[in-house]
Protein backbone atom coordinates (compact mmCIF):
# COMPACT_ATOMS: atom_id res chain seq x y z
CA UNK A 1 0.00 0.00 0.00
CA UNK A 2 1.46 3.37 -0.96
CA UNK A 3 1.98 6.36 1.26
CA UNK A 4 -0.70 8.41 -0.54
CA UNK A 5 -3.24 5.65 -0.04
CA UNK A 6 -2.38 5.54 3.65
CA UNK A 7 -2.73 9.30 3.93
CA UNK A 8 -6.10 9.32 2.21
CA UNK A 9 -7.36 6.50 4.39
CA UNK A 10 -6.17 8.22 7.59
CA UNK A 11 -7.87 11.49 6.61
CA UNK A 12 -11.23 10.00 5.66
CA UNK A 13 -12.95 10.91 8.89
CA UNK A 14 -12.63 13.90 11.19
CA UNK A 15 -14.37 12.18 14.10
CA UNK A 16 -12.36 10.99 17.15
CA UNK A 17 -10.81 7.55 16.68
CA UNK A 18 -11.78 4.61 18.82
CA UNK A 19 -9.18 2.43 20.52
CA UNK A 20 -9.70 -0.32 17.94
CA UNK A 21 -9.18 2.14 15.08
CA UNK A 22 -5.99 3.41 16.72
CA UNK A 23 -4.76 -0.17 17.07
CA UNK A 24 -5.61 -0.90 13.44
CA UNK A 25 -3.64 2.12 12.24
CA UNK A 26 -0.58 1.24 14.29
CA UNK A 27 -0.80 -2.41 13.23
CA UNK A 28 -0.92 -1.40 9.57
CA UNK A 29 1.99 1.03 10.07
CA UNK A 30 4.19 -1.60 11.76
CA UNK A 31 3.40 -4.26 9.14
CA UNK A 32 4.31 -1.83 6.36
CA UNK A 33 7.54 -0.88 8.18
CA UNK A 34 8.59 -4.52 8.69
CA UNK A 35 8.00 -5.28 5.01
CA UNK A 36 9.89 -2.23 3.72
CA UNK A 37 12.44 -1.87 6.52
CA UNK A 38 11.72 1.83 7.11
CA UNK A 39 8.95 4.31 8.05
CA UNK A 40 8.95 8.08 7.57
CA UNK A 41 7.94 10.60 10.24
CA UNK A 42 5.12 11.89 8.06
CA UNK A 43 3.60 8.39 7.89
CA UNK A 44 3.75 8.14 11.69
CA UNK A 45 2.07 11.54 12.06
CA UNK A 46 -0.69 10.46 9.66
CA UNK A 47 -1.32 7.31 11.70
CA UNK A 48 -1.54 9.04 15.09
CA UNK A 49 -4.79 10.64 16.33
CA UNK A 50 -5.19 14.36 15.67
CA UNK A 51 -5.76 15.09 19.36
CA UNK A 52 -2.42 13.55 20.45
CA UNK A 53 -0.11 16.48 21.23
CA UNK A 54 2.05 15.07 24.04
CA UNK A 55 5.64 15.01 22.71
CA UNK A 56 6.66 12.29 25.21
CA UNK A 57 3.94 9.92 23.99
CA UNK A 58 4.93 10.50 20.35
CA UNK A 59 8.62 9.92 21.18
CA UNK A 60 7.73 6.68 22.99
CA UNK A 61 5.83 5.40 19.95
CA UNK A 62 8.74 6.32 17.64
CA UNK A 63 11.14 4.52 20.01
CA UNK A 64 8.85 1.47 20.05
CA UNK A 65 8.86 1.35 16.23
CA UNK A 66 12.66 1.77 16.13
CA UNK A 67 13.03 -1.02 18.68
CA UNK A 68 11.33 -3.40 16.25
CA UNK A 69 14.23 -2.95 13.81
CA UNK A 70 12.32 -0.46 11.63
CA UNK A 71 14.35 2.54 10.50
CA UNK A 72 12.53 5.84 11.16
CA UNK A 73 13.70 8.50 8.67
CA UNK A 74 12.72 11.97 7.50
CA UNK A 75 12.61 10.83 3.88
CA UNK A 76 12.56 7.45 2.13
CA UNK A 77 16.15 6.06 1.87
CA UNK A 78 17.91 5.58 -1.46
CA UNK A 79 17.95 2.21 -3.19
CA UNK A 80 21.68 1.71 -2.69
CA UNK A 81 21.36 2.33 1.07
CA UNK A 82 18.80 -0.47 1.27
CA UNK A 83 21.00 -2.69 -0.88
CA UNK A 84 24.13 -2.14 1.23
CA UNK A 85 22.27 -2.66 4.53
CA UNK A 86 21.84 -6.01 6.30
CA UNK A 87 18.08 -5.66 6.87
CA UNK A 88 16.54 -8.95 5.82
CA UNK A 89 13.09 -9.13 4.26
CA UNK A 90 10.29 -10.08 6.65
CA UNK A 91 7.35 -12.22 5.59
CA UNK A 92 3.78 -11.01 6.02
CA UNK A 93 3.08 -13.54 8.79
CA UNK A 94 6.16 -12.48 10.78
CA UNK A 95 5.26 -8.81 10.36
CA UNK A 96 1.72 -9.40 11.65
CA UNK A 97 3.01 -11.32 14.71
CA UNK A 98 5.52 -8.59 15.60
CA UNK A 99 2.88 -5.91 15.09
CA UNK A 100 0.49 -7.64 17.50
CA UNK A 101 3.26 -8.02 20.09
CA UNK A 102 4.19 -4.34 19.80
CA UNK A 103 0.60 -3.10 20.06
CA UNK A 104 0.29 -4.35 23.63
CA UNK A 105 2.97 -1.86 24.66
CA UNK A 106 1.65 0.85 22.32
CA UNK A 107 -1.78 0.75 24.03
CA UNK A 108 -0.24 2.20 27.17
CA UNK A 109 0.87 5.33 25.32
CA UNK A 110 -2.68 6.60 24.67
CA UNK A 111 -3.66 8.77 27.63
CA UNK A 112 -1.50 7.09 30.32
CA UNK A 113 1.14 8.49 32.61
CA UNK A 114 4.72 8.99 31.42
CA UNK A 115 6.26 8.77 34.90
CA UNK A 116 9.15 6.28 34.49
CA UNK A 117 8.66 4.55 37.86
CA UNK A 118 4.93 4.04 37.34
CA UNK A 119 5.51 2.82 33.78
CA UNK A 120 8.19 0.40 35.01
CA UNK A 121 5.95 -1.10 37.69
CA UNK A 122 2.94 -1.30 35.36
CA UNK A 123 4.77 -2.89 32.43
CA UNK A 124 6.55 -5.31 34.77
CA UNK A 125 3.20 -6.57 36.02
CA UNK A 126 1.97 -7.24 32.48
CA UNK A 127 4.65 -9.87 31.82
CA UNK A 128 3.65 -13.44 32.65
CA UNK A 129 5.86 -15.62 34.81
CA UNK A 130 7.76 -18.44 33.12
CA UNK A 131 7.38 -22.12 33.81
CA UNK A 132 10.35 -24.48 33.93
CA UNK A 133 9.57 -25.54 30.34
CA UNK A 134 9.42 -21.91 29.17
CA UNK A 135 12.79 -21.21 30.77
CA UNK A 136 14.34 -24.21 29.00
CA UNK A 137 12.96 -23.03 25.66
CA UNK A 138 14.40 -19.54 26.15
CA UNK A 139 17.73 -20.91 27.42
CA UNK A 140 17.99 -23.11 24.33
CA UNK A 141 17.31 -20.09 22.13
CA UNK A 142 20.16 -18.22 23.81
CA UNK A 143 22.45 -21.24 23.58
CA UNK A 144 21.70 -21.84 19.89
CA UNK A 145 22.12 -18.14 19.10
CA UNK A 146 25.51 -18.11 20.82
CA UNK A 147 26.50 -21.24 18.92
CA UNK A 148 25.51 -19.59 15.64
CA UNK A 149 27.53 -16.52 16.58
CA UNK A 150 30.58 -18.64 17.37
CA UNK A 151 30.08 -20.55 14.12
CA UNK A 152 29.86 -17.28 12.18
CA UNK A 153 32.95 -15.92 13.90
CA UNK A 154 34.87 -19.15 13.27
CA UNK A 155 34.21 -18.79 9.53
CA UNK A 156 36.57 -15.79 9.56
CA UNK A 157 40.26 -16.84 9.79
CA UNK A 158 41.17 -13.47 11.31
CA UNK A 159 38.80 -14.06 14.23
CA UNK A 160 40.27 -17.52 14.84
CA UNK A 161 43.72 -15.92 14.95
CA UNK A 162 42.47 -13.47 17.61
CA UNK A 163 41.15 -16.37 19.70
CA UNK A 164 44.47 -18.23 19.45
CA UNK A 165 46.31 -15.08 20.56
CA UNK A 166 44.11 -14.99 23.66
CA UNK A 167 44.88 -18.65 24.39
CA UNK A 168 48.59 -17.88 24.10
CA UNK A 169 48.17 -15.11 26.70
CA UNK A 170 46.43 -17.63 28.96
CA UNK A 171 49.40 -19.98 28.64
CA UNK A 172 51.73 -17.13 29.66
CA UNK A 173 49.44 -16.23 32.61
CA UNK A 174 48.92 -12.75 31.20
CA UNK A 175 45.13 -13.11 31.54
CA UNK A 176 42.87 -15.42 33.55
CA UNK A 177 41.35 -18.36 31.72
CA UNK A 178 37.82 -17.55 32.92
CA UNK A 179 38.03 -14.16 31.19
CA UNK A 180 37.99 -15.99 27.85
CA UNK A 181 36.48 -19.45 28.42
CA UNK A 182 33.90 -20.49 31.00
CA UNK A 183 33.89 -24.23 30.30
CA UNK A 184 34.75 -26.99 27.83
CA UNK A 185 31.56 -28.88 26.99
CA UNK A 186 31.67 -32.67 26.68
CA UNK A 187 29.40 -33.54 23.70
CA UNK A 188 28.72 -37.02 25.12
CA UNK A 189 27.51 -35.54 28.40
CA UNK A 190 25.27 -33.11 26.53
CA UNK A 191 23.76 -36.01 24.59
CA UNK A 192 23.11 -37.97 27.80
CA UNK A 193 21.40 -34.97 29.34
CA UNK A 194 19.25 -34.47 26.26
CA UNK A 195 18.17 -38.13 26.43
CA UNK A 196 17.48 -37.87 30.16
CA UNK A 197 20.26 -40.32 31.04
CA UNK A 198 22.59 -37.87 32.75
CA UNK A 199 22.77 -37.26 36.47
CA UNK A 200 21.86 -33.95 38.00
CA UNK A 201 24.38 -32.00 40.00
CA UNK A 202 24.89 -33.47 43.43
CA UNK A 203 25.09 -30.04 45.05
CA UNK A 204 22.09 -27.85 44.52
CA UNK A 205 22.53 -24.10 44.39
CA UNK A 206 22.16 -22.12 47.54
CA UNK A 207 18.50 -21.58 48.34
CA UNK A 208 17.29 -18.11 49.18
CA UNK A 209 16.60 -17.44 52.83
CA UNK A 210 14.36 -14.93 54.50
CA UNK A 211 16.97 -14.15 57.15
CA UNK A 212 19.53 -11.75 55.76
CA UNK A 213 21.85 -12.16 58.72
CA UNK A 214 22.07 -15.89 58.12
CA UNK A 215 22.85 -15.25 54.46
CA UNK A 216 25.74 -12.96 55.35
CA UNK A 217 27.08 -15.45 57.90
CA UNK A 218 26.94 -18.34 55.45
CA UNK A 219 28.63 -16.25 52.77
CA UNK A 220 31.43 -15.29 55.13
CA UNK A 221 32.06 -18.82 56.41
CA UNK A 222 32.20 -20.29 52.91
CA UNK A 223 34.32 -17.51 51.40
CA UNK A 224 37.72 -19.12 52.02
CA UNK A 225 36.54 -22.56 50.89
CA UNK A 226 35.02 -21.04 47.75
CA UNK A 227 38.30 -19.30 46.93
CA UNK A 228 40.22 -22.59 47.24
CA UNK A 229 37.69 -24.45 45.09
CA UNK A 230 37.72 -21.66 42.52
CA UNK A 231 41.53 -21.72 42.25
CA UNK A 232 41.51 -25.50 41.77
CA UNK A 233 38.76 -25.28 39.16
CA UNK A 234 40.60 -22.55 37.25
CA UNK A 235 43.79 -24.62 37.16
CA UNK A 236 41.85 -27.63 35.85
CA UNK A 237 39.99 -25.48 33.29
CA UNK A 238 43.26 -23.97 32.08
CA UNK A 239 44.71 -27.41 31.32
CA UNK A 240 41.55 -28.42 29.46
CA UNK A 241 41.55 -25.21 27.42
CA UNK A 242 45.22 -25.52 26.46
CA UNK A 243 44.75 -29.14 25.36
CA UNK A 244 41.54 -28.37 23.46
CA UNK A 245 42.96 -25.42 21.54
CA UNK A 246 46.17 -27.27 20.67
CA UNK A 247 44.18 -29.31 18.11
CA UNK A 248 42.41 -26.17 16.88
CA UNK A 249 45.78 -24.48 16.30
CA UNK A 250 46.99 -27.45 14.23
CA UNK A 251 43.85 -27.40 12.08
CA UNK A 252 44.14 -23.62 11.72
CA UNK A 253 47.69 -23.85 10.36
CA UNK A 254 46.58 -26.52 7.88
CA UNK A 255 43.57 -24.39 6.87
CA UNK A 256 45.76 -21.33 6.22
CA UNK A 257 48.18 -23.42 4.19
CA UNK A 258 45.31 -24.76 2.10
CA UNK A 259 43.93 -21.24 1.66
CA UNK A 260 47.26 -19.94 0.37
CA UNK A 261 47.49 -22.78 -2.15
CA UNK A 262 43.87 -22.78 -3.28
CA UNK A 263 40.89 -20.55 -2.39
CA UNK A 264 38.18 -20.18 0.25
CA UNK A 265 35.80 -22.49 -1.66
CA UNK A 266 38.20 -25.44 -1.88
CA UNK A 267 36.90 -28.64 -0.28
CA UNK A 268 39.99 -29.12 1.92
CA UNK A 269 39.71 -25.57 3.25
CA UNK A 270 36.01 -26.07 3.99
CA UNK A 271 36.76 -29.37 5.75
CA UNK A 272 39.35 -27.75 8.05
CA UNK A 273 37.03 -24.79 8.67
CA UNK A 274 34.16 -27.09 9.67
CA UNK A 275 36.47 -29.09 11.95
CA UNK A 276 37.56 -25.89 13.71
CA UNK A 277 33.95 -24.73 13.98
CA UNK A 278 32.91 -28.03 15.58
CA UNK A 279 35.77 -27.76 18.08
CA UNK A 280 34.85 -24.17 18.94
CA UNK A 281 31.23 -25.20 19.50
CA UNK A 282 32.47 -27.38 22.36
CA UNK A 283 33.81 -24.23 24.05
CA UNK A 284 31.54 -22.03 26.13
CA UNK A 285 33.15 -18.63 25.72
CA UNK A 286 32.62 -15.82 28.19
CA UNK A 287 29.83 -13.54 27.00
CA UNK A 288 32.11 -10.52 27.16
CA UNK A 289 34.63 -12.29 24.91
CA UNK A 290 31.98 -13.14 22.32
CA UNK A 291 30.90 -9.50 22.35
CA UNK A 292 34.51 -8.42 21.85
CA UNK A 293 35.00 -10.73 18.85
CA UNK A 294 31.66 -9.65 17.41
CA UNK A 295 32.56 -5.98 17.80
CA UNK A 296 35.89 -6.55 16.06
CA UNK A 297 34.19 -8.25 13.10
CA UNK A 298 31.44 -5.64 13.03
CA UNK A 299 34.01 -2.84 13.00
CA UNK A 300 35.69 -4.31 9.92
CA UNK A 301 32.37 -4.53 8.06
CA UNK A 302 31.46 -0.97 9.04
CA UNK A 303 34.81 0.21 7.69
CA UNK A 304 34.11 -1.65 4.44
CA UNK A 305 30.71 0.00 4.11
CA UNK A 306 32.24 3.40 4.79
CA UNK A 307 34.74 2.94 1.95
CA UNK A 308 31.98 1.67 -0.34
CA UNK A 309 29.87 4.75 0.38
CA UNK A 310 32.80 7.05 -0.33
CA UNK A 311 33.42 5.35 -3.70
CA UNK A 312 29.69 5.47 -4.45
CA UNK A 313 29.52 9.20 -3.68
CA UNK A 314 32.45 9.89 -5.99
CA UNK A 315 31.03 7.83 -8.86
CA UNK A 316 27.43 9.07 -8.57
CA UNK A 317 27.78 12.68 -7.38
CA UNK A 318 31.04 13.76 -9.04
CA UNK A 319 31.51 11.44 -11.99
CA UNK A 320 27.71 11.30 -12.61
CA UNK A 321 27.76 7.58 -13.38
CA UNK A 322 24.36 5.93 -13.72
CA UNK A 323 23.24 4.42 -10.41
CA UNK A 324 22.01 1.10 -11.80
CA UNK A 325 25.17 0.72 -13.86
CA UNK A 326 27.36 1.41 -10.80
CA UNK A 327 25.55 -1.13 -8.62
CA UNK A 328 25.60 -3.78 -11.33
CA UNK A 329 29.25 -3.35 -12.36
CA UNK A 330 31.19 -2.08 -9.33
CA UNK A 331 29.99 -4.26 -6.44
CA UNK A 332 31.18 -7.55 -8.05
CA UNK A 333 34.56 -5.90 -8.82
CA UNK A 334 34.96 -4.03 -5.57
CA UNK A 335 38.60 -5.08 -4.97
CA UNK A 336 39.63 -5.30 -8.65
CA UNK A 337 42.22 -2.54 -9.03
CA UNK A 338 41.93 -2.78 -12.84
CA UNK A 339 38.21 -1.94 -12.78
CA UNK A 340 38.70 1.81 -13.12
CA UNK A 341 41.12 1.38 -16.06
CA UNK A 342 38.64 -0.88 -17.81
CA UNK A 343 35.81 1.62 -17.27
CA UNK A 344 37.88 4.52 -18.60
CA UNK A 345 38.84 2.47 -21.65
CA UNK A 346 35.17 1.89 -22.50
CA UNK A 347 34.87 5.54 -23.51
CA UNK A 348 31.53 6.26 -21.89
CA UNK A 349 30.13 9.71 -21.15
CA UNK A 350 31.62 9.76 -17.66
CA UNK A 351 35.04 8.30 -18.63
CA UNK A 352 36.88 11.67 -18.58
CA UNK A 353 35.42 12.59 -15.19
CA UNK A 354 36.25 9.11 -13.89
CA UNK A 355 39.86 9.60 -15.01
CA UNK A 356 40.12 12.76 -12.85
CA UNK A 357 39.08 10.83 -9.73
CA UNK A 358 41.20 7.77 -10.59
CA UNK A 359 43.62 8.12 -7.64
CA UNK A 360 40.91 8.74 -5.03
CA UNK A 361 38.98 5.62 -6.08
CA UNK A 362 42.14 3.49 -6.36
CA UNK A 363 43.20 4.53 -2.85
CA UNK A 364 39.92 3.33 -1.35
CA UNK A 365 39.92 0.14 -3.44
CA UNK A 366 43.45 -0.57 -2.19
CA UNK A 367 42.23 -0.26 1.41
CA UNK A 368 39.44 -2.73 0.65
CA UNK A 369 41.91 -5.13 -0.98
CA UNK A 370 44.24 -4.89 2.05
CA UNK A 371 41.33 -5.64 4.35
CA UNK A 372 40.47 -8.67 2.23
CA UNK A 373 44.06 -9.93 2.59
CA UNK A 374 43.98 -9.32 6.34
CA UNK A 375 40.78 -11.31 6.87
CA UNK A 376 41.85 -13.93 4.27
CA UNK A 377 38.32 -14.09 2.83
CA UNK A 378 36.44 -12.04 0.26
CA UNK A 379 34.46 -8.91 1.09
CA UNK A 380 31.19 -10.64 0.21
CA UNK A 381 31.99 -13.58 2.49
CA UNK A 382 32.86 -11.20 5.31
CA UNK A 383 29.54 -9.39 4.84
CA UNK A 384 27.67 -12.69 4.86
CA UNK A 385 29.43 -13.75 8.07
CA UNK A 386 28.55 -10.42 9.68
CA UNK A 387 24.94 -10.76 8.54
CA UNK A 388 24.64 -14.20 10.16
CA UNK A 389 26.30 -12.91 13.32
CA UNK A 390 23.98 -9.88 13.57
CA UNK A 391 20.95 -12.12 13.04
CA UNK A 392 22.09 -14.43 15.86
CA UNK A 393 22.79 -11.44 18.10
CA UNK A 394 19.22 -10.22 17.65
CA UNK A 395 17.81 -13.64 18.53
CA UNK A 396 20.03 -13.88 21.61
CA UNK A 397 19.18 -10.34 22.75
CA UNK A 398 15.44 -10.94 22.32
CA UNK A 399 15.58 -14.21 24.30
CA UNK A 400 17.61 -12.61 27.09
CA UNK A 401 15.20 -9.69 27.21
CA UNK A 402 12.27 -12.09 27.57
CA UNK A 403 13.97 -13.94 30.43
CA UNK A 404 14.91 -10.69 32.18
CA UNK A 405 11.44 -9.13 31.91
CA UNK A 406 9.79 -12.23 33.32
CA UNK A 407 11.99 -12.10 36.45
CA UNK A 408 11.92 -8.39 37.28
CA UNK A 409 9.49 -9.07 40.12
CA UNK A 410 12.08 -11.40 41.67
CA UNK A 411 14.51 -8.47 41.85
CA UNK A 412 11.99 -6.31 43.70
CA UNK A 413 11.15 -9.07 46.19
CA UNK A 414 14.86 -9.44 47.04
CA UNK A 415 15.60 -5.70 47.04
CA UNK A 416 12.87 -5.12 49.67
CA UNK A 417 14.98 -7.01 52.22
CA UNK A 418 17.89 -4.57 51.83
CA UNK A 419 16.11 -1.24 52.34
CA UNK A 420 17.38 1.25 54.94
CA UNK A 421 20.96 0.15 54.32
CA UNK A 422 22.16 3.44 52.80
CA UNK A 423 20.82 3.11 49.23
CA UNK A 424 17.50 4.22 47.78
CA UNK A 425 15.02 1.50 46.84
CA UNK A 426 15.20 2.34 43.13
CA UNK A 427 19.00 2.11 43.26
CA UNK A 428 18.70 -1.33 44.85
CA UNK A 429 16.36 -2.41 42.04
CA UNK A 430 18.80 -1.11 39.44
CA UNK A 431 21.73 -2.99 40.98
CA UNK A 432 19.59 -6.11 41.30
CA UNK A 433 18.69 -5.88 37.62
CA UNK A 434 22.40 -5.85 36.77
CA UNK A 435 22.82 -9.06 38.75
CA UNK A 436 19.78 -10.51 36.96
CA UNK A 437 21.38 -9.82 33.58
CA UNK A 438 24.57 -11.59 34.69
CA UNK A 439 22.48 -14.56 35.83
CA UNK A 440 20.84 -14.77 32.40
CA UNK A 441 24.27 -14.83 30.74
CA UNK A 442 25.53 -17.66 32.97
CA UNK A 443 22.38 -19.76 33.44
CA UNK A 444 22.78 -23.49 32.67
CA UNK A 445 19.39 -25.11 32.25
CA UNK A 446 20.87 -28.64 32.14
CA UNK A 447 21.68 -28.53 35.86
CA UNK A 448 18.03 -29.19 36.61
CA UNK A 449 16.92 -26.24 38.74
CA UNK A 450 14.77 -23.24 37.90
CA UNK A 451 16.25 -19.95 36.80
CA UNK A 452 14.82 -18.04 39.77
CA UNK A 453 16.71 -20.30 42.20
CA UNK A 454 19.97 -19.64 40.36
CA UNK A 455 19.33 -15.91 39.81
CA UNK A 456 18.61 -15.25 43.49
CA UNK A 457 22.30 -15.57 44.35
CA UNK A 458 23.43 -13.22 41.57
CA UNK A 459 20.80 -10.61 42.44
CA UNK A 460 21.62 -10.75 46.15
CA UNK A 461 25.34 -10.52 45.47
CA UNK A 462 24.91 -7.50 43.18
CA UNK A 463 22.79 -5.68 45.77
CA UNK A 464 25.09 -6.42 48.72
CA UNK A 465 28.16 -5.40 46.71
CA UNK A 466 26.54 -2.11 45.71
CA UNK A 467 25.60 -1.39 49.34
CA UNK A 468 29.18 -2.06 50.42
CA UNK A 469 30.64 0.11 47.64
CA UNK A 470 28.19 3.01 47.55
CA UNK A 471 26.23 3.24 50.80
CA UNK A 472 28.99 4.68 53.00
CA UNK A 473 30.79 7.98 52.47
CA UNK A 474 34.10 6.27 53.29
CA UNK A 475 34.23 2.94 51.45
CA UNK A 476 34.91 -0.16 53.52
CA UNK A 477 36.03 -3.44 51.87
CA UNK A 478 33.34 -6.07 51.41
CA UNK A 479 34.99 -8.60 53.74
CA UNK A 480 35.14 -5.96 56.50
CA UNK A 481 31.45 -5.15 55.95
CA UNK A 482 30.67 -8.84 56.49
CA UNK A 483 32.78 -8.87 59.68
CA UNK A 484 30.98 -5.76 60.99
CA UNK A 485 27.60 -7.34 60.25
CA UNK A 486 28.64 -10.49 62.10
CA UNK A 487 29.82 -8.44 65.09
CA UNK A 488 26.55 -6.49 65.19
CA UNK A 489 24.54 -9.70 64.98
CA UNK A 490 26.47 -11.30 67.87
CA UNK A 491 26.15 -8.08 69.88
CA UNK A 492 22.36 -8.01 69.45
CA UNK A 493 22.09 -11.69 70.34
CA UNK A 494 24.13 -11.18 73.53
CA UNK A 495 21.98 -8.16 74.46
CA UNK A 496 18.79 -10.23 74.05
CA UNK A 497 20.15 -13.11 76.14
CA UNK A 498 21.76 -11.15 79.00
CA UNK A 499 20.25 -7.67 78.79
CA UNK A 500 23.72 -6.09 78.70
CA UNK A 501 25.75 -4.59 75.88
CA UNK A 502 28.92 -6.65 75.34
CA UNK A 503 32.25 -4.85 75.66
CA UNK A 504 35.24 -5.39 73.40
CA UNK A 505 36.62 -8.19 75.59
CA UNK A 506 33.34 -10.11 75.51
CA UNK A 507 33.01 -9.64 71.74
CA UNK A 508 36.56 -10.90 71.28
CA UNK A 509 35.63 -14.02 73.23
CA UNK A 510 32.40 -14.60 71.30
CA UNK A 511 33.95 -13.97 67.88
CA UNK A 512 37.22 -15.76 68.72
CA UNK A 513 39.30 -12.80 67.61
CA UNK A 514 41.99 -10.66 69.32
CA UNK A 515 40.61 -7.80 71.40
CA UNK A 516 42.71 -5.15 69.63
CA UNK A 517 41.22 -6.24 66.31
CA UNK A 518 37.71 -5.96 67.78
CA UNK A 519 38.50 -2.39 68.84
CA UNK A 520 39.67 -1.55 65.33
CA UNK A 521 36.50 -3.06 63.85
CA UNK A 522 34.34 -1.05 66.27
CA UNK A 523 36.20 2.09 65.27
CA UNK A 524 35.75 1.38 61.56
CA UNK A 525 32.06 0.59 62.04
CA UNK A 526 31.28 4.14 63.16
CA UNK A 527 29.20 6.01 60.62
CA UNK A 528 30.53 9.41 59.48
CA UNK A 529 28.37 12.44 60.18
CA UNK A 530 28.27 15.69 58.24
CA UNK A 531 29.70 18.81 59.86
CA UNK A 532 26.81 20.71 58.28
CA UNK A 533 24.29 18.81 60.41
CA UNK A 534 21.98 21.45 61.94
CA UNK A 535 21.88 21.75 65.73
CA UNK A 536 18.57 22.63 67.34
CA UNK A 537 15.40 23.80 65.68
CA UNK A 538 17.00 26.81 64.00
CA UNK A 539 19.30 26.49 60.99
CA UNK A 540 21.72 29.11 62.34
CA UNK A 541 24.14 26.68 64.00
CA UNK A 542 25.75 23.50 62.68
CA UNK A 543 27.72 20.66 64.22
CA UNK A 544 30.99 22.03 62.84
CA UNK A 545 30.57 25.20 64.90
CA UNK A 546 30.94 23.19 68.14
CA UNK A 547 34.10 21.26 67.18
CA UNK A 548 37.36 22.64 68.55
CA UNK A 549 39.96 23.62 65.98
CA UNK A 550 43.37 22.95 67.53
CA UNK A 551 45.12 24.93 64.78
CA UNK A 552 43.40 28.20 65.72
CA UNK A 553 44.26 30.30 68.80
CA UNK A 554 41.59 30.59 71.47
CA UNK A 555 40.04 34.08 71.74
CA UNK A 556 41.31 34.55 75.34
CA UNK A 557 44.85 33.58 74.36
CA UNK A 558 44.74 35.87 71.33
CA UNK A 559 43.68 38.82 73.53
CA UNK A 560 46.45 38.07 76.05
CA UNK A 561 49.12 37.83 73.32
CA UNK A 562 47.97 41.13 71.83
CA UNK A 563 48.11 42.85 75.21
CA UNK A 564 51.55 41.35 75.95
CA UNK A 565 52.85 42.64 72.62
CA UNK A 566 51.61 46.17 73.36
CA UNK A 567 53.04 46.25 76.92
CA UNK A 568 56.41 44.87 75.75
CA UNK A 569 56.56 47.52 73.03
CA UNK A 570 55.85 50.32 75.55
CA UNK A 571 58.48 49.05 78.01
CA UNK A 572 61.16 48.77 75.32
CA UNK A 573 60.41 52.31 74.21
CA UNK A 574 61.27 53.49 77.74
CA UNK A 575 64.87 52.27 77.19
CA UNK A 576 67.48 53.95 75.00
CA UNK A 577 67.13 53.11 71.27
CA UNK A 578 70.42 51.19 71.37
CA UNK A 579 69.40 49.07 74.37
CA UNK A 580 65.94 48.41 72.92
CA UNK A 581 67.38 47.25 69.59
CA UNK A 582 69.92 44.97 71.30
CA UNK A 583 67.14 43.29 73.31
CA UNK A 584 64.93 42.97 70.21
CA UNK A 585 67.73 41.27 68.26
CA UNK A 586 68.86 39.03 71.14
CA UNK A 587 65.33 37.74 71.92
CA UNK A 588 63.85 37.95 68.38
CA UNK A 589 61.12 40.44 69.31
CA UNK A 590 59.31 41.58 66.12
CA UNK A 591 61.93 39.65 64.12
CA UNK A 592 62.05 36.32 62.34
CA UNK A 593 64.64 34.84 64.71
CA UNK A 594 66.94 35.72 67.60
CA UNK A 595 70.61 36.66 67.10
CA UNK A 596 73.89 35.72 68.78
CA UNK A 597 76.20 38.21 70.50
CA UNK A 598 78.55 38.01 67.51
CA UNK A 599 75.74 38.86 65.04
CA UNK A 600 74.49 41.79 67.12
CA UNK A 601 78.10 43.06 67.54
CA UNK A 602 78.62 43.11 63.77
CA UNK A 603 75.37 45.09 63.45
CA UNK A 604 76.65 47.80 65.85
CA UNK A 605 80.31 47.43 64.86
CA UNK A 606 81.40 46.62 68.44
CA UNK A 607 82.74 43.58 70.23
CA UNK A 608 80.55 40.82 71.57
CA UNK A 609 81.63 41.69 75.10
CA UNK A 610 80.30 45.21 74.68
CA UNK A 611 76.98 43.82 73.44
CA UNK A 612 76.81 41.55 76.52
CA UNK A 613 77.32 44.54 78.78
CA UNK A 614 74.58 46.54 77.01
CA UNK A 615 72.19 43.57 77.28
CA UNK A 616 72.92 43.12 81.02
CA UNK A 617 72.36 46.82 81.68
CA UNK A 618 69.04 46.79 79.78
CA UNK A 619 67.79 43.72 81.65
CA UNK A 620 68.63 45.37 85.00
CA UNK A 621 66.49 48.34 83.97
CA UNK A 622 63.62 45.99 83.07
CA UNK A 623 63.78 44.41 86.52
CA UNK A 624 62.93 47.77 88.10
CA UNK A 625 59.48 47.55 89.74
CA UNK A 626 58.10 50.34 87.56
CA UNK A 627 58.61 48.12 84.52
CA UNK A 628 58.53 44.54 85.85
CA UNK A 629 55.16 44.92 87.59
CA UNK A 630 53.45 45.50 84.24
CA UNK A 631 54.86 42.19 82.90
CA UNK A 632 54.33 40.15 86.09
CA UNK A 633 50.57 39.77 85.45
CA UNK A 634 51.28 37.94 82.17
CA UNK A 635 53.69 35.60 83.94
CA UNK A 636 51.03 34.79 86.56
CA UNK A 637 48.47 33.96 83.84
CA UNK A 638 50.90 31.55 82.15
CA UNK A 639 51.58 29.82 85.52
CA UNK A 640 47.85 29.39 86.12
CA UNK A 641 47.53 27.62 82.76
CA UNK A 642 50.32 25.25 83.62
From Swiss-Prot:
InterPro entries: RNA_pol_sigma-70_dom, RNA_pol_sigma70, RNA_pol_sigma70_r1_2, RNA_pol_sigma70_r2, RNA_pol_sigma70_r3, RNA_pol_sigma70_r4, RNA_pol_sigma_70_non-ess, RNA_pol_sigma_70_r1_1. It comes from the Bacteria. Sigma factors are initiation factors that promote the attachment of RNA polymerase to specific initiation sites and are then released. This sigma factor is the primary sigma factor during exponential growth. Interacts transiently with the RNA polymerase catalytic core. A motif (Interaction with polymerase core subunit RpoC) lies at residues 427-430. This is RNA polymerase sigma factor RpoD. The lineage of its organism: Bacteria, Pseudomonadati, Pseudomonadota, Betaproteobacteria, Neisseriales. Residues 571-624 are annotated as: Sigma-70 factor domain-4. It comes from Neisseria gonorrhoeae. Residues 597-616 bind DNA. Residues 403-473 are annotated as: Sigma-70 factor domain-2. GO terms for cellular component: cytoplasm.
